[in-house]
């Protein structure tokens, strides 16, 4: 997407005009204009010159945004500051003249303020002073007239047109009344001129312009706050970097840093580029990028990111990504691109905005004509028409969606949740199914030791010492898990001899003359005797989805160490939160059914789909899409097709660049709880957009009839043009202020979650409990039943056991496949005999 800065837009009618003009350019496939940021995003093959020409011909200005988002944004911010300063000066000058005008026009009549003696009874002089003061206010605010009438001549009237027409009509009519009064005074004296004083609307013209300027200032200030999150990100990047050249430290501008440069970072400094630590260790605060408040330890080989803060030690790093390629720049670009797109919900407002101003002008003319036909004076009829013009506000409609999108995206960026488009921000909250890839998403993606079970007569330390010696020379992933666990528990590797790795089976080596063996249950069973109690333990571990590793020395079993790709601590909570939102959670994995169900049970998902090959995930997602709107969460290369196929693709931040490119939402952390947080933020943003649109529509729906005088005969309600201008000024301010409430949304708090979908098992297979019937001898009474029941239900995979001593049976319901030997052992340990 190519982005452009657009100048001269003042309301939704302007943005609609620009969008319509650019969309007609050959080669443009999509165009989205953002009134909030005065920017435009264009996709297609059209050249920049053709696009800029189309905008210029529509009466506005356009320029290509800078290549670096940080510089472009800073330039845009400077333009906004200058515009705000100019607006402030205009307002102060307008207020000075308005106060004097109100003193002469209303102060004497309403509050009895004294007038200079030469003005007492001199109505013509009073009118002339009001004309001059009003003219001064009009000159100060001439931009409304230049923009408004230029747009009218081009056939694309905007909000400035409404203001210009309203103020001009009030000024023109009052000027005509002044000339008529002068003529009457010349021919009939002061008494003949007196009635014309009530026909002056000079103060209305000046008040309209001043109040609209007040509203524009409030709106500009509030709009500035909507981009605070993006501005804070841009300010994170350091302006200077310390590079090592010729063994010396040199300070250079950060933008001159090149890939491969060695740079130093002292405690308290920001890291200037993405890179890798080559010397030193420290704790780095990465909260700016990930939202994670706890510092992350860094040492040689660790990755570091630009704009994160080195907190303690001295680091030397090699730059790998600089300038616009850093993670920070990509985040800024992503947030900026998302703000340049439009949400589907904005389409209605866009359609209305395109015809809003011409319709309002038509209503104003009809209003004037109707009141004249009803016998009212020209002044009264004109006042009603002016009220219609100045109360109507297309800005509120135009801002309703983009302000909420901007604030929502900013909130997401603060919390490490990046929505690539406005569509993804709107649609994420509507998903009814979330499919989670198991490895790296629900689980940590790397094996870890979960159980250490020494054999009888063997100490825990003895088992770990032998396992450490044997696994130290293995390159298997499970060996790394065992070594890490041994290191944490004080077991150091010892030098072995005659080390042999038998593919698919196990390991063998000699340590101090003793023969060590390690490997699968089957491999060790063939080499040494395995006691029944340890065999039962290995069956239990396998049933829980773990991999038991057995170790023996000189033919004697030392014990079992189990390893598994353990689930992340926050995964069950994340799944629970999603289910509490009414979202069905499905786990996809290539693992076998038994392992998959064990992990699924720990995570608490609704459904497990096991045995899914990498290229089969996309087909599963296609099938699930028939049952509802689906989000796919993954991190690997083989997840990319599924992420693309899903309605919303969510990439875990620790994943690959390919997965991130294919996704609609990127989670900078690897926390699964960020998925419900993204849904929560999306729902809050969509709710805010609906509130804004409701306010904008209801304001105009009620305000225009009130201004036209529809309720005068029914309730006696009418609206002075000055109050109409005040209402118009506040309408946009209210919409922007409402959007700012999104800053207070607690995206990680489930306190206010509610279900918008009902989780139904209608479309997916039930997780039916397996049932096993055991025949047992030796049970004589209810106490026997209770003992057997308690023993069976103590097993983790047993849901319930119905035991009958009269029938001599136990009906066992299982949540996962469980070896019969495990059930049998549990019963026979209580001195009963299982016969079938």
Stretch-by-stretch model annotation:
Residues 89, 308, 429-475, 505-586, ...:
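ATP-driven catalytic headpiece of P-type ATPases
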Residues 1-127, 150, 232, 248-249, ...:
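Flexible metal-binding regulatory segments at protein termini and peripheral loops
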Residues 71, 75, 181-185, 190-193, ...:
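Juxtamembrane coupling segments of multi-pass membrane pumps/enzymes
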Residues 26-49, 199-200, 231-325, 422-467, ...:
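Conserved cytosolic catalytic loops of P-type ATPases
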Residues 110-124, 153, 172, 411, ...:
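Membrane-embedded alpha-helical bundles of multi-pass transporters
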Residues 85-240, 351, 716-721, 727:
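Transmembrane helix-loop-helix hairpins at the membrane interface
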Residues 289, 348, 383, 396-470, ...:
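Conserved catalytic phosphorylation-site environment of P-type ATPases
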Residues 16, 267, 431, 511-513, ...:
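Conserved ATP-binding TGD loop and adjacent catalytic N/P-domain core of P-type ATPases
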């Amino acid at each position: 997407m190519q982005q452009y800065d657009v100048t001269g837009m003042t309301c939704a009618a302007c943005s609609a005009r620009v969008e319509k003009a650019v969309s007609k350019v050959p080669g443009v496939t999509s165009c989205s204009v953002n009134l909030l940021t005065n920017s435009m995003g264009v996709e297609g093959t059209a050249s920049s010159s053709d696009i800029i020409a189309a905008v210029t011909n529509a009466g506005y200005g356009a320029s290509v945004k800078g290549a670096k988002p940080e510089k472009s944004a800073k330039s845009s911010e400077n333009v906004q500051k200058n515009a705000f300063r100019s607006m402030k000066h205009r307002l102060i000058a307008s207020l000075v003249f308005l106060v004097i005008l109100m003193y002469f026009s209303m102060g004497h009549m309403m509050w009895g303020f004294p007038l200079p003696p030469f003005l007492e009874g001199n109505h013509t002089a009073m009118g002339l002073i009001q004309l001059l003061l009003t003219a001064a206010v009009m000159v100060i605010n001439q931009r409304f007239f230049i923009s408004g009438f230029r747009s009218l001549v081009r056939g694309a009237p905007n909000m400035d047109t409404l203001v210009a027409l309203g103020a001009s009509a009030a000024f023109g009519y009052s000027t005509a009344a002044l000339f008529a009064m002068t003529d009457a005074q010349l021919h009939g004296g002061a008494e003949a001129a007196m009635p014309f004083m009530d026909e002056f609307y000079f103060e209305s013209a000046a008040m309209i312009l001043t109040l609209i300027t007040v509203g524009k200032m409030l709106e500009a200030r509030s709009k500035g706050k909507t981009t605070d999150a993006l501005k804070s990100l841009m300010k994170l990047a350091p302006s200077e970097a310390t590079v090592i050249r010729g063994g010396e430290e040199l300070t250079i501008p950060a933008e001159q840093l090149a890939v491969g440069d060695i740079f130093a970072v002292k405690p308290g400094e920001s890291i200037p580029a993405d890179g890798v630590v080559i010397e030193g260790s420290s704790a780095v605060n990465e909260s700016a990028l990930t939202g994670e408040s706890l510092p992350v330890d860094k040492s040689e080989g660790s990755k570091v990111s630009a704009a994160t803060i080195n907190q303690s030690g001295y680091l030397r790093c090699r730059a790998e990504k600089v300038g616009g390629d850093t993670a920070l720049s990509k985040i800024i670009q992503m947030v900026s691109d998302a703000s340049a797109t439009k949400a589907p919900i904005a389409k209605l407002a866009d359609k209305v905005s395109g015809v809003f101003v011409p319709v309002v002008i038509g209503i104003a003319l009809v209003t004037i004509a109707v009141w004249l036909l009803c016998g009212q004076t020209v002044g009264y009829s004109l006042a009603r028409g002016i009220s219609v013009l100045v109360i109507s506000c297309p800005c509120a409609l135009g801002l309703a969606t983009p302000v909420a999108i901007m604030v929502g995206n900013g909130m997401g960026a603060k919390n490490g949740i990046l929505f690539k488009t406005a569509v993804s921000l709107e649609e994420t909250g509507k998903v009814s199914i979330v499919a989670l890839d198991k490895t790296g998403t629900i689980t940590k993606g790397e094996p870890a030791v979960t159980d250490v079970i020494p054999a009888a007569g063997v100490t825990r330390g003895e088992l770990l010492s032998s396992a450490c010696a044997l696994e130290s020379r293995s390159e298997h992933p499970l060996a790394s898990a065992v070594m890490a666990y041994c290191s944490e528990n004080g077991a150091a590797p010892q030098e072995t001899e005659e080390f042999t790795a038998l593919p698919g089976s196990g390991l063998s080596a000699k340590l101090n003359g003793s023969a060590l063996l390690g490997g699968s249950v089957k491999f060790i069973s063939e080499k040494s005797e395995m006691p029944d109690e340890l065999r039962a333990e290995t069956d239990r571990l396998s049933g829980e989805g773990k991999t038991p590793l057995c170790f023996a020395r000189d033919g004697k079993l030392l014990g079992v160490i189990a390893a598994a790709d353990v689930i992340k601590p926050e995964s069950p909570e994340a799944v629970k939160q999603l289910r509490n939102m009414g979202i069905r959670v499905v786990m996809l994995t290539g693992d076998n059914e038994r392992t998959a169900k064990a992990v699924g049970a720990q995570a608490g998902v609704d459904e497990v789909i096991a045995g899914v090959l990498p290229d089969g995930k996309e087909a599963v997602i296609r099938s699930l899409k028939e049952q509802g709107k689906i989000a796919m969460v993954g991190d690997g290369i083989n997840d990319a097709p599924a992420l693309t196929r899903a309605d919303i693709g969510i990439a875990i931040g620790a994943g690959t660049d390919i997965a991130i490119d294919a996704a609609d939402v990127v989670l900078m952390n690897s926390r699964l709880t960020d998925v419900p947080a993204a849904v929560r933020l999306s729902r809050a943003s969509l709710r805010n957009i609906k509130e804004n649109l409701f306010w904008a529509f209801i304001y105009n729906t009620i305000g225009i009839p009130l201004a036209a005088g529809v309720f005068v005969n029914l309730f006696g309600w009418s609206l002075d043009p000055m109050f109409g201008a005040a209402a118009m000024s506040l309408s946009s301010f209210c919409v922007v202020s409402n959007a700012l409430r999104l800053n207070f949304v607690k995206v990680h708090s489930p306190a206010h979650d509610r279900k918008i979908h009902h989780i139904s098992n209608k479309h997916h297979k039930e997780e039916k409990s397996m049932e096993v019937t055991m025949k047992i001898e030796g049970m004589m009474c209810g106490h026997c039943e209770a003992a057997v029941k308690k023993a069976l239900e103590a097993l983790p995979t047993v849901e319930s056991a119905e035991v009958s001593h009269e029938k001599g049976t136990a009906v066992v319901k299982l949540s996962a496949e469980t070896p019969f030997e495990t059930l049998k052992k549990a019963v026979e340990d209580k001195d009963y005999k299982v016969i079938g």
